[in-house]
Amino acid sequence: VSFARPHSPYDPPQRYLDIYKNAPVPDPAIGDWCDKYAKKLDPEKAAQDAPYGNFGNEYARNSKRHYYANITFIDEQIGRVIQTLKKKGMYDDALIIFVSDHGDMMGDHYHWRKTYPYEGSTHVPYIVKWPAADHIAPGKIDAPVELRDILPTFLDVADVTIPADMDGRSLLPLAKGTETNWRKYLDLEHATCYSDDNYWCALTDGKIKYVWRIHTGAEELFDLTKDPQELHNAVNDKKYKKQLEEMRNEMIRHLSERGEEFIKDGQLVVREKTMLYGPNYPEK
């Protein structure tokens, strides 16, 4: 089941928006690294799909209210699906995975919408309701999982052989506590979109995040355990020197199979152009 909401435009039905009309909403998170976007802008004069912009805290809070209302709308629709499964006697046998393909920055660090390596854009829900026959107790698993794991999981639960060349891995052994060799990091990456410097690769285990800007060579390092809102880029902090080197080396190993366009002489290569070629991006 696929829903367009809560994707922009933020247009919830009015009765859901009324729920959040006077609700307290936090201001956006603003890091010490995003001054280039800090200039105050008039939202009435900005492009409707502006990817960056400081439109003020009240604008950001109002956007969040609309976003929250859309999420509540979706929650109610999912509830209808679940109630229908229960009425038909199908719920106990069902495997349900609730995920999203991306989040939304909602003004954090003066960024809007998606395609960024930051938590607002990348850290999405991943909720699994297992069939009763699998006897998996409710709980939270602290492991890096990704959307590519969905299909192998469904095949595994259905007792169908998972092809060896399939991307992703079944979550069932992880949920049962029998998985002993799970992935260490998630790979995040994006080709040029919105601006030339929005071309990046990142690695994270959910505790530390390393970002490599492929056009510029700029690096970012966030300690998500101590700084979950990514308020401080620790790339120049001496106390994070070892972790920076470790994550950089992990990125080198990760990208090495792609050849000299990405890694040369054991070093990350700054690319002048993106790998994104197409009629809409003739100069990229």
What are these regions (language model features)?
Residues 2-144, 157-165, 212-215, 219, ...:
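Active-site-proximal cap/lid insertion segments
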Residues 84, 88, 157, 237, ...:
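Structured segments of extracytoplasmic/periplasmic soluble domains
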Residues 19, 23, 174, 250, ...:
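Residues that form generic nucleotide/phosphate-binding pockets
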Residues 102-108, 148-151, 156-220, 224, ...:
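C-terminal cap/loop subdomain of S1 sulfatases and analogous C-terminal strand-loop tails that border
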